[in-house]
Protein backbone atom coordinates (compact mmCIF):
# COMPACT_ATOMS: atom_id res chain seq x y z
CA UNK A 1 0.00 0.00 0.00
CA UNK A 2 1.30 3.42 -0.96
CA UNK A 3 1.36 6.64 1.02
CA UNK A 4 -0.29 10.02 0.70
CA UNK A 5 1.61 13.28 0.33
CA UNK A 6 0.82 14.16 3.95
CA UNK A 7 2.12 10.80 5.21
CA UNK A 8 5.31 11.15 3.16
CA UNK A 9 6.09 14.63 4.46
CA UNK A 10 5.49 13.60 8.06
CA UNK A 11 7.56 10.43 7.71
CA UNK A 12 10.47 12.40 6.30
CA UNK A 13 10.41 14.73 9.31
CA UNK A 14 10.33 11.80 11.72
CA UNK A 15 13.31 10.06 10.15
CA UNK A 16 11.08 7.14 9.19
CA UNK A 17 10.22 5.47 5.92
CA UNK A 18 6.52 5.27 6.71
CA UNK A 19 3.99 6.66 9.18
CA UNK A 20 0.47 5.33 9.53
CA UNK A 21 -2.82 7.16 10.20
CA UNK A 22 -3.53 7.06 13.92
CA UNK A 23 0.15 6.85 14.85
CA UNK A 24 1.44 9.41 17.35
CA UNK A 25 4.57 11.13 16.11
CA UNK A 26 7.02 13.91 16.98
CA UNK A 27 8.15 15.37 13.65
CA UNK A 28 10.81 18.03 13.41
CA UNK A 29 9.35 21.35 12.33
CA UNK A 30 10.59 23.80 9.73
CA UNK A 31 8.64 26.82 10.98
CA UNK A 32 6.85 27.63 14.24
CA UNK A 33 4.47 30.55 13.78
CA UNK A 34 2.62 32.84 16.15
CA UNK A 35 0.97 36.27 16.11
CA UNK A 36 0.18 39.17 18.42
CA UNK A 37 -2.82 37.34 19.89
CA UNK A 38 -1.21 33.94 20.50
CA UNK A 39 2.50 34.74 20.87
CA UNK A 40 2.35 36.44 24.30
CA UNK A 41 1.07 33.24 25.93
CA UNK A 42 3.52 31.12 23.91
CA UNK A 43 6.41 33.27 25.14
CA UNK A 44 5.23 33.02 28.76
CA UNK A 45 4.97 29.23 28.50
CA UNK A 46 8.37 29.02 26.80
CA UNK A 47 9.96 30.92 29.68
CA UNK A 48 8.38 28.54 32.19
CA UNK A 49 10.44 25.71 30.70
CA UNK A 50 13.64 27.34 31.90
CA UNK A 51 15.21 26.86 28.48
CA UNK A 52 17.46 29.81 27.67
CA UNK A 53 17.47 29.70 23.87
CA UNK A 54 14.95 28.87 21.19
CA UNK A 55 15.77 25.79 19.16
CA UNK A 56 16.53 27.80 15.99
CA UNK A 57 16.10 31.58 15.64
CA UNK A 58 15.68 31.16 11.88
CA UNK A 59 12.75 28.74 12.16
CA UNK A 60 10.39 30.91 14.19
CA UNK A 61 8.04 33.49 12.69
CA UNK A 62 6.31 36.12 14.83
CA UNK A 63 3.84 38.23 12.87
CA UNK A 64 2.04 41.08 14.62
CA UNK A 65 -0.94 41.15 12.27
CA UNK A 66 -4.22 40.76 14.16
CA UNK A 67 -4.56 44.15 15.83
CA UNK A 68 -2.14 46.11 13.67
CA UNK A 69 -1.90 49.05 13.78
CA UNK A 70 -2.20 48.61 17.56
CA UNK A 71 -5.81 49.37 18.41
CA UNK A 72 -5.42 50.03 22.14
CA UNK A 73 -3.04 49.94 25.09
CA UNK A 74 -3.42 46.20 25.68
CA UNK A 75 -2.59 45.28 22.08
CA UNK A 76 0.38 47.67 22.15
CA UNK A 77 1.67 46.03 25.34
CA UNK A 78 1.30 42.58 23.80
CA UNK A 79 3.32 43.60 20.75
CA UNK A 80 5.97 45.22 22.94
CA UNK A 81 6.25 42.01 24.97
CA UNK A 82 6.72 39.87 21.86
CA UNK A 83 9.10 42.39 20.26
CA UNK A 84 11.38 42.22 23.29
CA UNK A 85 11.37 38.42 23.13
CA UNK A 86 12.22 38.53 19.42
CA UNK A 87 15.14 40.87 20.08
CA UNK A 88 16.37 38.77 23.00
CA UNK A 89 16.46 35.61 20.88
CA UNK A 90 17.44 37.33 17.62
CA UNK A 91 14.36 35.95 15.84
CA UNK A 92 14.93 36.45 12.12
CA UNK A 93 11.30 36.45 11.00
CA UNK A 94 9.72 39.14 13.16
CA UNK A 95 7.20 41.42 11.42
CA UNK A 96 5.59 44.55 12.80
CA UNK A 97 4.49 48.00 11.64
CA UNK A 98 5.17 48.80 7.99
CA UNK A 99 6.70 45.37 7.38
CA UNK A 100 3.75 43.39 8.65
CA UNK A 101 1.27 41.56 6.46
CA UNK A 102 -1.45 39.06 7.20
CA UNK A 103 0.65 36.08 8.25
CA UNK A 104 -0.77 33.45 5.91
CA UNK A 105 -0.21 35.67 2.89
CA UNK A 106 3.11 37.06 4.12
CA UNK A 107 5.02 33.85 4.82
CA UNK A 108 4.55 32.24 1.37
CA UNK A 109 5.24 35.58 -0.32
CA UNK A 110 8.53 35.90 1.58
CA UNK A 111 9.53 32.31 0.85
CA UNK A 112 9.67 31.53 4.56
CA UNK A 113 7.48 28.45 4.07
CA UNK A 114 8.21 26.11 1.16
CA UNK A 115 7.03 22.79 -0.32
CA UNK A 116 7.76 19.74 1.81
CA UNK A 117 7.79 21.69 5.09
CA UNK A 118 6.18 20.80 8.38
CA UNK A 119 4.71 24.01 9.82
CA UNK A 120 2.93 24.52 13.12
CA UNK A 121 1.17 27.79 13.85
CA UNK A 122 -0.78 29.19 16.78
CA UNK A 123 -3.53 30.19 14.38
CA UNK A 124 -6.15 27.84 12.98
CA UNK A 125 -5.68 29.02 9.40
CA UNK A 126 -2.06 27.86 9.34
CA UNK A 127 -3.42 25.14 7.05
CA UNK A 128 -3.07 27.73 4.24
CA UNK A 129 0.50 26.68 3.39
CA UNK A 130 -0.67 23.30 2.15
CA UNK A 131 -1.25 25.07 -1.17
CA UNK A 132 2.52 24.83 -1.61
CA UNK A 133 2.59 21.09 -0.99
CA UNK A 134 3.61 21.47 2.66
CA UNK A 135 2.10 19.98 5.80
CA UNK A 136 0.83 22.87 7.91
CA UNK A 137 -1.60 22.87 10.78
CA UNK A 138 -2.80 25.02 13.62
CA UNK A 139 -2.13 24.49 17.31
CA UNK A 140 -2.32 26.28 20.61
CA UNK A 141 0.09 28.71 22.20
CA UNK A 142 1.45 25.96 24.44
CA UNK A 143 2.20 23.85 21.36
CA UNK A 144 4.20 26.75 19.94
CA UNK A 145 6.04 27.17 23.23
CA UNK A 146 7.07 23.51 23.08
CA UNK A 147 8.00 23.82 19.41
CA UNK A 148 10.17 26.89 20.07
CA UNK A 149 11.93 24.95 22.83
CA UNK A 150 12.40 21.57 21.15
CA UNK A 151 11.97 22.03 17.41
CA UNK A 152 9.37 19.27 17.43
CA UNK A 153 5.61 18.92 17.71
CA UNK A 154 3.51 15.99 18.95
CA UNK A 155 0.32 14.86 17.24
CA UNK A 156 -1.51 12.00 15.57
CA UNK A 157 -1.09 11.21 11.87
CA UNK A 158 -4.40 12.05 10.17
CA UNK A 159 -6.32 9.95 7.71
CA UNK A 160 -6.67 11.53 4.28
CA UNK A 161 -9.73 12.48 2.25
CA UNK A 162 -9.19 13.13 -1.44
CA UNK A 163 -11.10 15.74 -3.41
CA UNK A 164 -10.75 15.28 -7.16
CA UNK A 165 -11.60 18.56 -8.87
CA UNK A 166 -12.93 18.03 -12.41
CA UNK A 167 -14.24 20.03 -15.38
CA UNK A 168 -13.87 23.81 -15.71
CA UNK A 169 -15.01 26.81 -13.71
CA UNK A 170 -17.93 29.01 -14.64
CA UNK A 171 -17.56 32.77 -15.00
CA UNK A 172 -16.94 34.57 -11.69
CA UNK A 173 -16.26 31.28 -9.89
CA UNK A 174 -12.99 31.06 -7.97
CA UNK A 175 -11.18 28.99 -5.37
CA UNK A 176 -13.40 30.59 -2.72
CA UNK A 177 -16.50 29.13 -4.35
CA UNK A 178 -14.90 25.70 -4.66
CA UNK A 179 -14.09 25.47 -0.97
CA UNK A 180 -17.42 26.96 0.12
CA UNK A 181 -19.18 24.41 -2.08
CA UNK A 182 -17.13 21.56 -0.58
CA UNK A 183 -17.77 22.73 2.99
CA UNK A 184 -21.47 22.97 2.16
CA UNK A 185 -21.31 19.43 0.80
CA UNK A 186 -19.53 17.73 3.71
CA UNK A 187 -20.29 20.06 6.63
CA UNK A 188 -18.11 21.84 9.17
CA UNK A 189 -17.08 18.48 10.64
CA UNK A 190 -16.96 16.56 7.38
CA UNK A 191 -13.18 16.29 7.43
CA UNK A 192 -12.67 16.31 11.20
CA UNK A 193 -8.97 15.67 11.96
CA UNK A 194 -8.42 14.48 8.40
CA UNK A 195 -6.04 15.70 5.74
CA UNK A 196 -7.97 17.29 2.87
CA UNK A 197 -6.00 16.50 -0.28
CA UNK A 198 -6.94 18.37 -3.47
CA UNK A 199 -6.10 16.87 -6.84
CA UNK A 200 -7.61 16.38 -10.26
CA UNK A 201 -7.46 17.94 -13.74
CA UNK A 202 -8.82 21.33 -12.67
CA UNK A 203 -6.06 21.81 -10.08
CA UNK A 204 -3.52 22.33 -12.84
CA UNK A 205 -5.53 25.38 -13.95
CA UNK A 206 -5.93 26.92 -10.50
CA UNK A 207 -3.70 29.86 -9.62
CA UNK A 208 -1.68 29.84 -6.42
CA UNK A 209 -4.09 32.47 -5.09
CA UNK A 210 -7.01 30.06 -5.61
CA UNK A 211 -5.07 27.24 -3.99
CA UNK A 212 -4.20 29.34 -0.94
CA UNK A 213 -7.88 30.24 -0.56
CA UNK A 214 -8.93 26.60 -0.71
CA UNK A 215 -6.39 25.28 1.81
CA UNK A 216 -6.95 28.30 4.04
CA UNK A 217 -10.51 27.16 4.67
CA UNK A 218 -9.78 23.45 5.18
CA UNK A 219 -10.14 24.05 8.91
CA UNK A 220 -13.72 25.24 8.31
CA UNK A 221 -14.54 21.63 7.40
CA UNK A 222 -12.64 20.40 10.46
CA UNK A 223 -9.55 19.42 8.48
CA UNK A 224 -6.22 18.83 10.20
CA UNK A 225 -4.60 20.22 7.08
CA UNK A 226 -5.35 20.98 3.46
CA UNK A 227 -2.82 20.15 0.76
CA UNK A 228 -2.31 20.35 -3.01
CA UNK A 229 -0.05 18.23 -5.17
CA UNK A 230 2.81 20.56 -6.15
CA UNK A 231 3.31 21.11 -9.87
CA UNK A 232 4.72 23.57 -12.40
CA UNK A 233 2.50 26.36 -11.09
CA UNK A 234 3.89 25.74 -7.61
CA UNK A 235 7.43 25.74 -8.94
CA UNK A 236 6.95 29.04 -10.76
CA UNK A 237 5.66 30.63 -7.57
CA UNK A 238 8.22 29.19 -5.18
CA UNK A 239 11.43 29.31 -7.24
CA UNK A 240 11.73 33.10 -7.10
CA UNK A 241 10.78 33.33 -3.42
CA UNK A 242 12.19 30.38 -1.50
CA UNK A 243 14.77 31.23 1.15
CA UNK A 244 15.97 27.63 1.33
CA UNK A 245 15.82 24.28 -0.41
CA UNK A 246 12.48 22.60 -0.86
CA UNK A 247 11.15 19.25 -2.00
CA UNK A 248 8.03 18.14 -3.85
CA UNK A 249 6.17 15.13 -2.47
CA UNK A 250 3.43 13.38 -4.43
CA UNK A 251 0.92 10.78 -3.26
CA UNK A 252 1.38 7.24 -4.51
CA UNK A 253 -1.25 5.97 -6.91
CA UNK A 254 -2.18 3.22 -4.46
CA UNK A 255 -2.31 5.48 -1.41
CA UNK A 256 -5.18 4.78 0.96
CA UNK A 257 -7.93 7.36 1.51
CA UNK A 258 -10.72 7.40 4.04
CA UNK A 259 -13.02 8.85 1.36
CA UNK A 260 -12.72 10.14 -2.18
CA UNK A 261 -14.99 12.88 -3.52
CA UNK A 262 -15.33 13.61 -7.23
CA UNK A 263 -16.29 17.28 -7.60
CA UNK A 264 -17.79 18.43 -10.89
CA UNK A 265 -16.72 22.06 -10.65
CA UNK A 266 -18.74 23.05 -13.72
CA UNK A 267 -21.82 22.78 -11.50
CA UNK A 268 -20.49 25.35 -9.03
CA UNK A 269 -21.92 28.86 -9.25
CA UNK A 270 -20.77 31.88 -7.20
CA UNK A 271 -21.47 30.91 -3.61
CA UNK A 272 -22.55 32.72 -0.47
CA UNK A 273 -22.14 31.25 3.00
CA UNK A 274 -25.10 32.43 5.06
CA UNK A 275 -24.96 33.10 8.80
CA UNK A 276 -23.90 31.46 11.04
CA UNK A 277 -21.78 28.59 9.66
CA UNK A 278 -19.43 28.33 6.67
CA UNK A 279 -21.36 25.21 5.63
CA UNK A 280 -24.61 27.15 5.22
CA UNK A 281 -23.95 27.72 1.53
CA UNK A 282 -26.17 28.65 -1.38
CA UNK A 283 -25.68 29.95 -4.89
CA UNK A 284 -25.88 33.75 -4.90
CA UNK A 285 -28.66 33.57 -7.49
CA UNK A 286 -30.80 31.49 -5.12
CA UNK A 287 -30.91 33.84 -2.14
CA UNK A 288 -33.52 36.51 -1.59
CA UNK A 289 -32.39 40.13 -1.90
CA UNK A 290 -30.26 40.80 1.17
CA UNK A 291 -29.30 44.40 1.82
CA UNK A 292 -25.96 45.00 3.50
CA UNK A 293 -24.20 47.69 5.51
CA UNK A 294 -20.57 46.73 4.89
CA UNK A 295 -18.27 44.92 2.49
CA UNK A 296 -14.79 43.65 3.38
CA UNK A 297 -12.38 42.62 0.62
CA UNK A 298 -9.16 41.25 2.08
CA UNK A 299 -7.84 38.78 4.70
CA UNK A 300 -5.60 35.71 4.51
CA UNK A 301 -8.35 34.13 2.40
CA UNK A 302 -8.81 36.75 -0.32
CA UNK A 303 -6.45 39.69 0.12
CA UNK A 304 -3.95 38.84 -2.61
CA UNK A 305 -3.28 40.89 -5.73
CA UNK A 306 -5.39 38.56 -7.89
CA UNK A 307 -8.36 39.17 -5.58
CA UNK A 308 -7.95 42.94 -5.71
CA UNK A 309 -7.70 42.88 -9.51
CA UNK A 310 -11.01 41.05 -9.78
CA UNK A 311 -12.69 43.41 -7.32
CA UNK A 312 -11.31 46.50 -9.07
CA UNK A 313 -12.47 45.30 -12.49
CA UNK A 314 -16.05 45.17 -11.22
CA UNK A 315 -15.99 48.33 -9.12
CA UNK A 316 -14.57 50.20 -12.11
CA UNK A 317 -17.71 49.28 -14.06
CA UNK A 318 -20.00 50.52 -11.30
CA UNK A 319 -17.90 53.64 -10.72
CA UNK A 320 -19.18 54.21 -7.16
CA UNK A 321 -19.92 51.97 -4.21
CA UNK A 322 -23.39 52.27 -2.72
CA UNK A 323 -23.70 55.17 -0.28
CA UNK A 324 -25.25 52.82 2.29
CA UNK A 325 -22.34 50.39 2.22
CA UNK A 326 -19.01 50.91 3.98
CA UNK A 327 -16.52 49.23 1.66
CA UNK A 328 -13.17 48.19 3.13
CA UNK A 329 -10.25 47.16 0.93
CA UNK A 330 -7.46 45.45 2.88
CA UNK A 331 -4.40 44.34 0.86
CA UNK A 332 -2.95 41.33 2.67
CA UNK A 333 0.70 42.43 2.63
CA UNK A 334 2.82 45.52 1.91
CA UNK A 335 3.88 43.90 -1.37
CA UNK A 336 0.26 43.44 -2.41
CA UNK A 337 -0.48 47.03 -1.36
CA UNK A 338 2.46 48.33 -3.39
CA UNK A 339 1.52 46.30 -6.44
CA UNK A 340 -2.11 47.44 -6.21
CA UNK A 341 -0.84 51.01 -6.03
CA UNK A 342 1.39 50.56 -9.08
CA UNK A 343 -1.44 48.98 -11.08
CA UNK A 344 -3.86 51.78 -10.26
CA UNK A 345 -6.21 49.51 -8.33
CA UNK A 346 -6.17 51.62 -5.18
CA UNK A 347 -7.12 54.68 -7.23
CA UNK A 348 -10.14 52.79 -8.57
CA UNK A 349 -11.19 51.85 -5.05
CA UNK A 350 -10.64 55.36 -3.68
CA UNK A 351 -12.48 57.06 -6.52
CA UNK A 352 -15.38 54.67 -5.92
CA UNK A 353 -15.62 55.73 -2.28
CA UNK A 354 -14.00 52.70 -0.65
CA UNK A 355 -11.79 52.77 2.45
CA UNK A 356 -8.20 51.59 1.93
CA UNK A 357 -6.62 49.96 4.97
CA UNK A 358 -3.07 48.97 5.82
CA UNK A 359 -2.58 45.18 5.91
CA UNK A 360 -4.36 43.81 8.99
CA UNK A 361 -6.54 40.93 10.17
CA UNK A 362 -8.65 43.60 11.92
CA UNK A 363 -12.31 43.08 11.03
CA UNK A 364 -12.03 39.36 10.25
CA UNK A 365 -11.85 38.44 13.93
CA UNK A 366 -13.95 41.35 15.12
CA UNK A 367 -10.82 43.07 16.35
CA UNK A 368 -11.00 46.55 14.85
CA UNK A 369 -10.96 48.45 11.53
CA UNK A 370 -14.53 47.54 10.56
CA UNK A 371 -16.67 46.26 13.42
CA UNK A 372 -20.39 45.59 12.91
CA UNK A 373 -23.15 47.05 15.06
CA UNK A 374 -26.32 45.27 16.17
CA UNK A 375 -28.45 44.24 13.20
CA UNK A 376 -25.83 45.12 10.58
CA UNK A 377 -25.01 42.80 7.70
CA UNK A 378 -21.67 42.40 5.92
CA UNK A 379 -20.59 40.61 2.74
CA UNK A 380 -16.98 39.60 3.29
CA UNK A 381 -14.20 37.67 1.58
CA UNK A 382 -13.01 36.38 4.97
CA UNK A 383 -13.30 32.79 6.18
CA UNK A 384 -15.65 32.60 9.18
CA UNK A 385 -19.18 33.78 9.83
CA UNK A 386 -19.92 32.51 13.32
CA UNK A 387 -22.29 34.57 15.43
CA UNK A 388 -20.52 37.75 16.52
CA UNK A 389 -17.43 37.00 14.44
CA UNK A 390 -17.10 40.56 13.08
CA UNK A 391 -18.70 42.45 15.92
CA UNK A 392 -22.07 42.48 17.67
CA UNK A 393 -23.68 39.09 18.31
CA UNK A 394 -26.77 40.32 16.48
CA UNK A 395 -24.83 41.25 13.33
CA UNK A 396 -24.71 38.92 10.33
CA UNK A 397 -21.78 37.93 8.13
CA UNK A 398 -22.03 36.49 4.61
CA UNK A 399 -18.93 34.88 3.07
CA UNK A 400 -18.40 35.48 -0.65
CA UNK A 401 -15.68 35.70 -3.28
CA UNK A 402 -14.09 39.06 -4.27
CA UNK A 403 -16.23 39.42 -7.40
CA UNK A 404 -19.47 39.01 -5.47
CA UNK A 405 -18.18 41.31 -2.71
CA UNK A 406 -17.40 44.05 -5.24
CA UNK A 407 -20.76 43.70 -6.97
CA UNK A 408 -22.52 43.80 -3.61
CA UNK A 409 -20.67 46.97 -2.63
CA UNK A 410 -22.07 48.68 -5.72
CA UNK A 411 -25.64 47.35 -5.60
CA UNK A 412 -26.12 47.64 -1.85
CA UNK A 413 -27.25 44.04 -1.53
CA UNK A 414 -25.59 40.65 -2.08
CA UNK A 415 -25.36 40.58 -5.85
CA UNK A 416 -23.93 38.61 -8.73
CA UNK A 417 -21.18 40.33 -10.74
CA UNK A 418 -23.39 39.84 -13.79
CA UNK A 419 -25.70 42.51 -12.37
CA UNK A 420 -23.04 45.18 -12.86
Swiss-Prot record:
GO BP? L-leucine biosynthetic process
The catalysed reaction is: (2R,3S)-3-isopropylmalate = (2S)-2-isopropylmalate
Keyword ATP-binding set for record: no
Matches recorded under Pfam families: Aconitase
Q: Where does [4Fe-4S] cluster bind?
A: 300, 361, 364
State its cofactor: [4Fe-4S] cluster
Tell me the cofactor note: Binds 1 [4Fe-4S] cluster per subunit.
What is a single molecular function from GO for this protein? 4 iron, 4 sulfur cluster binding
Which keywords does this chain's UniProt record carry?
4Fe-4S, Amino-acid biosynthesis, Branched-chain amino acid biosynthesis, Iron, Iron-sulfur, Leucine biosynthesis, Lyase, Metal-binding
Instruction: Give the EC number.
Output: 4.2.1.33
Gene3D superfamilies linked: Aconitase, domain 3 (3.30.499.10)
The pathway to which it is assigned is: Amino-acid biosynthesis; L-leucine biosynthesis; L-leucine from 3-methyl-2-oxobutanoate: step 2/4
The annotated subunit structure for this chain is: Heterodimer of LeuC and LeuD.
Q: Give the protein's function.
A: Catalyzes the isomerization between 2-isopropylmalate and 3-isopropylmalate, via the formation of 2-isopropylmaleate.
Into which family does the record put it? Belongs to the aconitase/IPM isomerase family. LeuC type 2 subfamily.
Report what the protein is called. 3-isopropylmalate dehydratase large subunit
Amino acid sequence: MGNTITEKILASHCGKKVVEPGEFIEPKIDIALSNDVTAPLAVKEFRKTGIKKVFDKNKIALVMDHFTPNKDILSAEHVKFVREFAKEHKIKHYYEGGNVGVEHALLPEKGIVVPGDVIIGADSHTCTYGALGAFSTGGGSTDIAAAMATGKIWFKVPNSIKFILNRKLNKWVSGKDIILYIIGLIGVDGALYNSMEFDGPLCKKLTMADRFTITNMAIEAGGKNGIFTPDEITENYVAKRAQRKYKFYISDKDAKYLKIYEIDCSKILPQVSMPFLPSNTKAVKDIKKTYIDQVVIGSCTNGRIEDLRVAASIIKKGKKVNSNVRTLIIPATPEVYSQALDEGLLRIFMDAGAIISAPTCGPCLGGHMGILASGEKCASTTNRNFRGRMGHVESQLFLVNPAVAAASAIKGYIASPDEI
